[in-house]
Amino acid sequence: DTARSRGLGDVYKRQDGDYAGQKSGQIVGWMSIKPIIMHVIVMDDSNIKSVTDLKGKRVGMGQPGGTSMLDADFLMRTAGLEPGKDFKDFRVKLPAMVDMLGNGQLDALIWNGSPPMPPVIKLKSQHKVRILDIPRDLSAKIRKASPAYTEGDLPANTYADQPNEVMSFRLGNVLLIKSSVPEDIVYQATKAVMENLDFMGTVHPAWKKVSKDGIINGFTIPLHPGALRYYREAGVPGIEAFAKSVGQ
């Protein structure tokens, strides 16, 4: 009964694609976690210097159904490269892409995730690779086309042998929940997560940057009443202004 999404407005209003014609408000917000950042990775000795250099190359795009694959498609199409036409696209999971890049089956891999990502750490420990800059003009086009994306760079030294900041863009990483889930269940679940963030950080690194201060960042749709109740009790900064802005 939970989900992740890129286009919050589309999910909430049910107005586009698979959501068209469905009743609005069935999916609502729960909590915001660490934003995910786009990575475009090539071998260090490759002559690929930019996204546009991927024309005619073999590119790992992520597995079907994953949000990272959607983001990779969006990036490449915005750069003017059509999957299957301008380059050969491979739809596989990140660990498989890491192996394929390392053994020469891919020229590049694209993944949108919360850094530092363990498969990328593994890749850099075994091979010399580079993370490509995504130029400001390209990221600006992406952000203009979809407000779900925001400007965000990969900080220097996120990975070994990465002394410089890498220009990129990011996507708010939010958890959604069905509005039909009982309020008290969501309240208790929210309370359990928020009061055990140290433990959650041992489960996945994305939780290490989660805090009360940023728990509603990136939301433009109503929150589940159970989550809203807890955030009010916990004194989440800006919660009343946010609730008013979405009519809660």
Locate each region found by the language model.
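Short beta-strand-centered segments that line the small-molecule binding cleft or hinge
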Residues: 13, 26-32
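Ligand-binding clefts/hinges and TM-proximal coupling segments of bilobed small-molecule sensing domains
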Residues: 64-74, 148-210, 216-219
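An extracytoplasmic/periplasmic, membrane-proximal ligand-sensing/linker region
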Residues: 96, 113-131, 141-144, 184-248
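Bilobed "Venus flytrap"/periplasmic-binding protein-like clamshell domains
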Residues: 35-103, 213, 217, 221-226
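Pocket-lining segment of extracytoplasmic ligand-binding domains
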Residues: 16-17, 83-181
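Short, solvent-exposed loop/turn segments at the edges of secondary structure
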Residues: 33-37, 169-170
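Short, solvent-exposed loop/beta-turn-alpha elements that line the ligand-binding surface or hinge
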Residues: 19-24, 217
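Single conserved hydrophobic/aromatic residue that forms the stacking wall/gate
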Residues: 1-8, 12
